[in-house]
Curated annotation (Swiss-Prot):
Protein name per Swiss-Prot or TrEMBL: Furin
Cytoplasmic side: 739-794
Species of the source: Homo sapiens (Human)
PROSITE patterns (alphabetical): P_HOMO_B, SUBTILASE, SUBTILASE_ASP, SUBTILASE_HIS, SUBTILASE_SER
Residues that carry a glycan: 387, 440, 553
Domain-level remarks: Contains a cytoplasmic domain responsible for its TGN localization and recycling from the cell surface.
Free-text cofactor note: Binds 3 calcium ions per subunit.
Length: 794
């Protein structure tokens, strides 16, 4: 019995070698698809296909259709005559042919770019393998062709000689000035050069004798001018939602202040733009948002306090120096997914790219330079497989990133054997590995979301608090998860000095994520209000079992606070089973890559599969959807599972007012069908028993005291405080006047009729601030009169 797997492996390997040898010798290799001519329209073709166990992949043109059969070997040296004969005997079939695999090669001849600065782009062409392996992707023929990237920043110099050839006006807009032109505003200090620099990293034109090359040098590049003015929630949302069925990738190298004390993230509109982007962008495959993790390392900042990099919808990218070290500006956190190269110390090279005023620079720096490099690599990967979803891309990053050559003292092995670091995520992006894996990638199962309320009552944090909870990851429910992607700890807590807190989350498989490290500059007493700390470190782990939350006071001070809410939110996928046969999946029309685009009646499209019931968090809706053919993008109307509004748990539609149920932290308004978040102050107290009635005279006394104390005590205290301050001021004033020889006779302290304050009884030299005193007595008098002037001004 032990030999059977080996025998199967040997047989499979032998068959593969035979096919390869036959292909090399020019023999025909038959596939499991047929081209069939059937007059009468798609309905007749579908009927014939179903009758004989075929699936109609769609109309080729005219009366010609593309049939597929799952029971036929995908590649064979001989045709499948029984299936062919039965189909041929069908009277509606006028012609058919089993399709033969043909050898086709791209006519690109790969040569290294000839641009003058290319040899200095060490991160693309490293001689010691310390690079992003981009040339391996280029050698496979992928240069970003057909992919559109937009830089959300301070504009893009669209007429730059190294950008103009790839500039895409459809991926550009000026949100600051409300016009289509993203040209940056020029200043003497070149303040608005950031976006142009980022754009060159992605798609600088190759072999034009100018500067260097972009990672995806045949991609289309655009820019959104949105940072050169007031940045509001509306500005961010408009930028994130620009032309989502044209733009594939959005690259952003900005965020809240990296000062080590700010906790901030996207507001309502921007959060909605993210959600709409991943659920509706790219025809439902999801927009890809690439984000720089932050430059607050010197301030001991944490990128988990940045709600943009901490979002499950963004692909957060950190930096490594030329020699593979953690840069001084880098922030460590558990939401970072991967790393690219950037600047480091003075003896390490920086990034070469386009610069403002049609120039070139060799000194682009920070995580601002890392995110565009990642966007370029993702563009190469999308060219290899345009059907990748936004979550597919994150899976590819996790599976192909390389920890090698990166130095850090916190590398750990998670529960599925992958190395992961808070400084680097899963390691350096590998462009060659990503495009190779993407070509035959199978779309991940639909995302599931499991919400678990952990706390039943508030808990005192003290010096150290540990909360343990064993969970089943929604076992027995439609949203049961067995393979984890993102995990969030949504915390509400109070603390007198937030920066002294360190928070960790330990998964059932033992992976310990640092959700928050101590931030010495954060003196805030605001705590956290339903803040979602996110970790990617347990990717692909089984989330069932005991989770442990650790909250620790890292200082010696006797700090105090209370944890009032802890919700564990798990995102992942269902158990992997056998693939559903396409004939019984409810799919009506597939693309050439066998991705479903139209479902039969009674089914809705969800993540390229047809389902009779949309999963929790989605509702059926008829929408215009887009899918890519070989040469174009087609628009069709189809029933799809549209995501609920971000505030709803379940819904009957995508609008804010379509909620059917709410998350645990919100309540449903049955009239407006909206979910409103509950605050601590708005929650009703439990009913209490009525106290026994007191005698009338006692009750009257209590009413008298209650009427005086609760309602008037603040006013009384405020009045007494003001009177005391005035008394102290008058006393000090009089004492100083007496010490100065002040006389009360004939004093006129001030006049207000001309808006002036004139002092009497003071020597004239007291007002001559520029004149030096002739004696210590005059100096003392000058100090005192200065004090009086200050107090009078008050």
């Amino acid at each position: 019995m032990e030999l059977r797997p080996w025998l199967l492996w040997v047989v499979a390997a032998t068959g593969t070698l035979v096919l390869l040898a036959a292909d090399a010798q020019g023999q025909k290799v038959f596939t499991n698809t047929w081209a069939v001519r059937i007059p009468g329209g798609p309905a007749v073709a579908n009927s014939v296909a179903r009758k004989h166990g075929f699936l109609n992949l769609g109309q080729i043109f005219g009366d010609y259709y593309h049939f597929w059969h799952r029971g036929v070997t995908k590649r064979s040296l001989s045709p499948h005559r029984p299936r062919h004969s039965r189909l041929q005997r069908e009277p509606q079939v006028q012609w058919l042919e089993q399709q033969v695999a043909k050898r086709r090669t791209k006519r690109d001849v790969y040569q290294e770019p000839t641009d003058p600065k290319f040899p200095q782009q060490w991160y693309l062409s490293g001689v010691t393998q310390r690079d992003l392996n981009v040339k391996a992707a280029w050698a496979q023929g992928y240069t970003g062709h057909g992919i559109v990237v937009s830089i959300l920043d301070d504009g893009i110099e669209k007429n730059h000689p190294d950008l103009a050839g790839n500039y895409d006006p459809g991926a550009s807009f000026d949100v600051n000035d409300q016009d289509p032109d993203p040209q940056p505003r020029y200043t003497q200090m070149n303040d608005n050069r950031h976006g142009t620099r980022c754009a060159g990293e992605v798609a600088a034109v190759a072999n034009n004798g100018v500067c260097g090359v972009g990672v995806a040098y045949n991609a289309r590049i655009g820019g959104v001018r949105m940072l050169d003015g007031e940045v509001t929630d509306a500005v961010e949302a408009r930028s994130l939602g620009l032309n989502p069925n044209h733009i594939h990738i959005y690259s952003a190298s900005w965020g809240p202040e990296d000062d080590g004390k700010t906790v901030d993230g996207p507001a309502r509109l921007a959060e909605e733009a993210f959600f709409r982007g991943v659920s509706q962008g790219r025809g439902g495959l999801g927009s890809i948002f690439v984000w720089a993790s932050g430059n607050g390392g010197r301030e001991h900042d944490s990128c988990n306090c940045d709600g943009y990099t901490n979002s499950i919808y963004t692909l957060s990218i950190s930096s490594a120096t030329q020699f593979g070290n953690v840069p001084w500006y880098s922030e460590a956190c558990s939401s970072t997914l991967a790393t690219t190269y950037s600047s480091g110390n003075q003896n390490e090279k920086q990034i070469v790219t386009t610069d403002l005023r049609q120039k070139c620079t060799e000194s682009h720096t920070g995580t601002s330079a890392s995110a565009p490099l990642a966007a370029g690599i993702i563009a190469l990967t999308l060219e290899a497989n345009k059907n990748l979803t936004w979550r597919d891309m994150q899976h590819l990053v996790v599976q192909t990133s390389k920890p090698a050559h990166l130095n850090a003292n916190d590398w750990a092995t998670n529960g599925v054997g992958r190395k992961v670091s808070h400084s680097y995520g899963y390691g350096l992006l590998d462009a060659g590995a990503m495009v190779a894996l993407a070509q035959n990638w199978t779309t991940v199962a639909p995302q599931r979301k499991c919400i678990i309320d952990i706390l039943t009552e508030p808990k005192d944090i003290g010096k150290r608090l540990e909360v343990r909870k064993t969970v089943t990851a929604c076992l027995g429910e439609p949203n049961h998860i067995t393979r984890l992607e993102h995990a969030q700890a949504r915390l509400t807590l109070s603390y007198n000095r937030r920066g002294d807190l360190a928070i960790h989350l330990v998964s059932p498989m033992g992976t310990r994520s640092t959700l928050l490290a101590a931030r010495p500059h954060d003196y805030s007493a605001d705590g956290f209000n339903d803040w979602a700390f996110m970790t990617t470190h347990s990717w692909d782990e089984d989330p069932s079992g005991e989770w442990v939350l650790e909250i620790e006071n890292t200082s010696e001070a006797n700090n105090y606070g209370t944890l009032t809410k802890f919700t564990l939110v798990l995102y992942g996928t269902a158990p992997e089973g056998l693939p559903v046969p396409p004939e019984s999946s409810g799919c009506k029309t597939l693309t050439s890559s066998q991705a479903c685009v139209v479902c039969e009646e009674g089914f809705s499209l969800h993540q390229k599969s047809c389902v009779q019931h949309c999963p929790p968090g989605f509702a059926p809706q008829v929408l215009d959807t887009h899918y890519s053919t070989e040469n174009d993008v087609e628009t069709i109307r189809a029933s799809v599972c549209a995501p609920c509004h971000a505030s709803c748990a379940t819904c009957q539609g995508p609008a804010l007012t379509d909620c059917l149920s709410c998350p645990s932290h919100a309540s449903l308004d049955p009239v407006e069908q909206t979910c409103s978040r509950q605050s601590q102050s708005s929650r009703e107290s439990p009913p209490q028993q009525q106290p026994p009635r007191l005698p009338p005279e006692v009750e009257a006394g209590q009413r008298l005291r209650a009427g005086l104390l609760p309602s008037h005590l603040p006013e009384v205290v405020a009045g007494l405080s003001c009177a005391f301050i005035v008394l102290v001021f008058v006393t000090v004033f009089l004492v100083l006047q007496l010490r100065s020889g002040f006389s009360f006779r004939g004093v006129k302290v001030y006049t207000m009729d001309r808006g002036l304050i004139s002092y009497k009884g003071l020597p004239p030299e007291a007002w001559q601030e520029e004149c030096p005193s002739d004696s210590e007595e005059d100096e003392g008098r000058g100090e005192r009169t200065a004090f009086i002037k200050d107090q009078s001004a008050l």
